[in-house]
UniProtKB/Swiss-Prot annotation:
<dbReference type="GO" id="GO:0047334">
    <property type="term" value="F:diphosphate-fructose-6-phosphate 1-phosphotransferase activity"/>
</dbReference>
<dbReference type="InterPro" id="IPR035966">
    <property type="entry name" value="PKF_sf"/>
</dbReference>
<dbReference type="InterPro" id="IPR000023">
    <property type="entry name" value="Phosphofructokinase_dom"/>
</dbReference>
<comment type="function">
    <text>Catalyzes the phosphorylation of D-fructose 6-phosphate, the first committing step of glycolysis. Uses inorganic phosphate (PPi) as phosphoryl donor instead of ATP like common ATP-dependent phosphofructokinases (ATP-PFKs), which renders the reaction reversible, and can thus function both in glycolysis and gluconeogenesis. Consistently, PPi-PFK can replace the enzymes of both the forward (ATP-PFK) and reverse (fructose-bisphosphatase (FBPase)) reactions.</text>
</comment>
<dbReference type="GO" id="GO:0046872">
    <property type="term" value="F:metal ion binding"/>
</dbReference>
<dbReference type="GO" id="GO:0006002">
    <property type="term" value="P:fructose 6-phosphate metabolic process"/>
</dbReference>
<keyword id="KW-0479">Metal-binding</keyword>
<feature type="binding site">
    <location>
        <position position="268"/>
    </location>
    <ligand>
        <name>substrate</name>
    </ligand>
</feature>
<feature type="binding site">
    <location>
        <begin position="325"/>
        <end position="328"/>
    </location>
    <ligand>
        <name>substrate</name>
    </ligand>
</feature>
<feature type="binding site">
    <location>
        <begin position="196"/>
        <end position="198"/>
    </location>
    <ligand>
        <name>substrate</name>
    </ligand>
</feature>
<comment type="subunit">
    <text>Homotetramer.</text>
</comment>
<keyword id="KW-0963">Cytoplasm</keyword>
<dbReference type="InterPro" id="IPR022953">
    <property type="entry name" value="ATP_PFK"/>
</dbReference>
<dbReference type="Pfam" id="PF00365">
    <property type="entry name" value="PFK"/>
</dbReference>
<dbReference type="GO" id="GO:0005737">
    <property type="term" value="C:cytoplasm"/>
</dbReference>
<feature type="binding site">
    <location>
        <position position="123"/>
    </location>
    <ligand>
        <name>Mg(2+)</name>
    </ligand>
</feature>
<feature type="site" description="Important for catalytic activity; stabilizes the transition state when the phosphoryl donor is PPi">
    <location>
        <position position="150"/>
    </location>
</feature>
Length: 409
């Protein structure tokens, strides 16, 4: 055992319902094992690391770390910073001209006396951590980097279940449980529920499934119009599945004629290629973030789907609602807390043996929970549309399963 003297924690990327709980779990576990180990938390992710801006974890914080399980977001703050995007780091004032952000980060860790860095984030955060770990190893810094996999998209290779995704699906379902009643407000209403998920439909599919569980647990009174058919999910559209717009419009028009409303769940990554092609044809700029990803909130897939379907199904009013920020900022649910604690416990164990990697259930190694080697971590894992529960759900709502589509990341 090679006990660390000082560890650092940072959270980065977009929010997910696990960040606060993961911070709390790491602080709790280190305190249980050896409270003499110093802990700091970098403020606003890699930004704080580059600027040397951190919180010291005091005895009071250790005593009250359990409070973090009750909150969403990240109390220590996030940012989207790519250490290998030198131009962006300079533009944002995080490093000076001529500086290498990776070296600045590495030197700051040494200056702060950090032995182990815990990064909590998605594929971008952990690929950034992988780059940093490789830089540290190549230049003999002797620091250990251990990642925890956060993403509501559940799209990280080769990790079976990323932290926060279960909660996000549950919260998205609860969000739509309120929104759906808007169909009462107008005849022939089309409600489009846009769910987060860049190039992965897992969250959209899982949210629809969780929402239908809520419907299963409800009592109905169709005699006065309280009919499950009107509250039902009528269509689920994900990037990995081909969409026959004409056939779906015909099917959904029949639903509209029968129940006076249509409710569809759309992944924010569905139809993006078509939307981007439209924008470029019009000479419009496609906005991207520091990692080169298209800014999906600017592209607005839900609006596009609404426009495509509205006329074809005879909708009098179209309502587009996005559950993403509501879902991703939630506190962790019981299932996620259990997963987070098991991952955090192993992360601390790995810290004591100085084993770098990303903690997760390794799909290529029998789903064993382990520190997965950084070079094997990558984003863009597609949702398997042949997953039995998804196939059953499509059959249950009367939607034909489209052909598989290869998605780019």
């Amino acid at each position: 055992m090679n006990k660390p003297k000082k560890v650092a924690i940072l959270t980065a990327g977009g929010l997910a319902p696990c960040l606060s709980s993961a911070i709390g779990s790491l602080i709790e576990r280190y305190t249980e094992i050896d409270p003499s180990i110093e802990i700091i938390c970098y403020r606003s992710g890699y930004k704080g690391l580059l600027l040397g801006d951190s919180y010291a974890v005091t005895p009071k914080i250790r005593e009250n770390a359990a409070l973090l399980h009750k909150f969403g977001g990240s109390p220590i703050g996030n940012s989207r910073v790519k250490l290998t995007n030198v131009k962006d780091c300079i533009k944002r004032g995080l490093v000076q001209e001529g500086q290498d952000p990776q070296k600045v980060a590495a030197d700051q860790l040494v200056k702060d006396g950090v032995d182990v860095l815990h990064t909590i984030g998605g594929d971008d955060t952990n690929t950034a951590a992988a780059d940093l770990a490789a830089f540290l190893a190549k230049n003999d810094y002797g620091l250990t980097v251990i990642g925890l996999p956060k993403t509501i998209d559940n799209d990280v290779f080769p990790i079976k279940q990323s932290l926060g995704a279960w909660t996000a699906a549950e919260q998205g379902a609860q969000y739509f449980q309120n929104v759906v009643a808007e169909y009462n407000a107008n005849p022939r209403m089309l409600i489009v529920h846009e769910v987060m998920g860049r190039n992965c439909g897992w969250l959209t599919a899982a949210t629809a499934m969780e929402y239908r569980k809520l419907l299963d647990r409800s009592e109905w009174l169709p005699e006065i119009g309280l009919d499950r058919a009107a509250y039902e999910v009528h269509g689920v559209f994900v990037p990995e599945m081909e969409i026959d717009l004409a056939a779906e419009a015909k099917r959904l028009r029949e639903v509209m004629d029968k129940v006076d409303c249509v409710n569809i769940f759309v992944s924010e990554g569905a139809g993006v290629d078509a939307i981007v092609a439209e924008m470029q044809a019009k000479g419009q700029e496609v906005p991207r973030d520091a990692f080169g990803h298209i800014k999906l909130d600017a592209v607005n897939p839900g609006k596009w789907f609404g426009e495509q379907f509205a006329e074809m199904i005879g909708a009098e009013k179209t309502l587009i609602q996005k559950s993403g920020y509501f879902a991703r900022a939630s506190a962790s649910n019981v299932d996620d807390i259990r997963l987070i604690k098991s991952c955090a416990d192993l992360a601390v164990e790995c810290a004591f043996r100085r084993e770098s990697g990303v903690i997760g259930h390794d799909e290529d190694n029998g789903n064993v929970l382990r520190a997965i080697e950084f070079p094997r971590i990558k984003g863009g894992k597609p949702f398997d549309i042949d997953t039995p529960w998804f196939v059953q759900m499509l059959a249950g709502i009367g939607q034909s399963k489209g052909a598989r589509v290869e998605v780019s990341h």
